[in-house]
């Protein structure tokens, strides 16, 4: 079966984005370190892989002819015919017995020319002729029941036209023909179910009772094939679609995916809602109210259309399961992709550290325990006013005892710890110190006296000093040019000084270095 993949998955695979422009911020280097455009590239590669895998799956779906060759559709026809003819043959009174020709005209009118199943009318009419010849009483009962139901439906729903009623009768008379419709011939149903009106549910109670006869055999034989969401047998938009239970592995995968997306959304939305507890409570209340409304709506739909949708649930999911899986996976990927983009932008622009700091402060302030909690955890002891007064009195008594044990002033003076001083005595002491210092300064010896005593010996006393005008720093002077004899005399003088005049410790004499003669 040549069928192109759904057009919804094509524009979602975007090209690789260029790296962001450098910003003059403190955390501009984080963008170059983490390289978020590489994350986007990896995400796009994953999206491409998933879309290619889904395209392969859709390309590998089997057609109607292959299923007939394998014998699956013939088995379903036989089981449905045997189940439809056997139970409760005499329960409904026969009002009219239409002939095979009238039944053929009804079924040909029931198949609309614009419907996808109009191509197989010849084969379906032959099957109906065989079944009507074999069981004329059953066909009469079924046609009379369907005509009565059409009358009731016409009274309840005046907007419904004749072709829809004929399609209803045709679908009831030939249930195997609805099973033979392939996935390529059926239009894709809407992904979200619409609530059915009560009038249509009342009008089709008898229809669902007969459709339940075919449900047992068809569901038992086609459980691995039929799964998920299926179209209605009449093709009318008023009858809703119901999801059949998926296998446990698929359910676990979808649960994990839903939990991951919910965690990401809560983490990003919680940052805005944490600041104001009132806003957070409003969000929780609105979320719980919406969940309760959704549960009530689901329960109403399930009670109204449970019996009529069991027959339609098996086939529609087989036809649309790839589209459903594709849409859910792409939604999750888009959410994760948008979250990563927001995180990368916040890292590059420098807003993430500020948000984290504010969140940490808010969390610390929010998690501060109250006085009651501290008392409950026995960290802050519970005390009454009387107990507090007693504790204060005990502390006062301890302080008064310590103050009474302090020594008196007389005792401190006697121990020479505290000295009584007057201004006159302090001035006299200062005057004595000044006189002593002046006397010492006046008695200082002069430079000549120090030289005589050989106490003050400066560098200028034993070195010839030249005046600044006569001194030249350049070394190319005749008295700086030493000959070999002058150098030898200098070395000899140094050796004599070291050996005779220089005092060296006996243990370190061997370390004295002499110059060569």
From Swiss-Prot:
Q: Does the keyword Phosphoprotein apply?
A: yes
List the InterPro entries: RPEL_repeat
Q: Which UniProt keywords apply?
A: Actin-binding, Coiled coil, Nucleus, Phosphoprotein, Protein phosphatase inhibitor, Repeat
The segments carrying the RPEL repeats are 52-77, 359-384, 397-422, 435-460
Q: Where is this region: Disordered?
A: 1-24, 41-247, 260-320
Gene3D superfamilies in the record: 6.10.140.1750, 6.10.140.2130
Expression sites by tissue: Diffusely expressed throughout the brain cortex, with highest levels in the cortex and the hippocampus and lower levels in the striatum and thalamus.
Which stretches are tagged as biased composition: Pro residues?
187-198
As for subcellular location, the record says: Nucleus matrix
Q: Where is the signal peptide?
A: none
A GO molecular-function annotation:
protein phosphatase inhibitor activity
Which portions of the chain have biased composition (kind: Basic and acidic residues)? 54-68, 260-300
| Subunit and partners | Binds actin and PPP1CA; thus inhibiting the protein phosphatase 1 (PP1) activity.
What's the protein here called? Phosphatase and actin regulator 3
GO cellular component labels: nuclear matrix
GO BP terms: actin cytoskeleton organization
Say which domain of life the source belongs to: Eukaryota
Transmembrane feature ranges: none
Chain positions found as Phosphothreonine: 29, 194
Where are stretches of biased composition, namely Polar residues? Answer: 92-129, 157-172
- In the UniProt record, the gene name given for this protein reads Phactr3
Tell me its family: Belongs to the phosphatase and actin regulator family.
In the record, which positions carry Phosphoserine? 188
Note the coiled coil stretches, chain numbering: 408-444
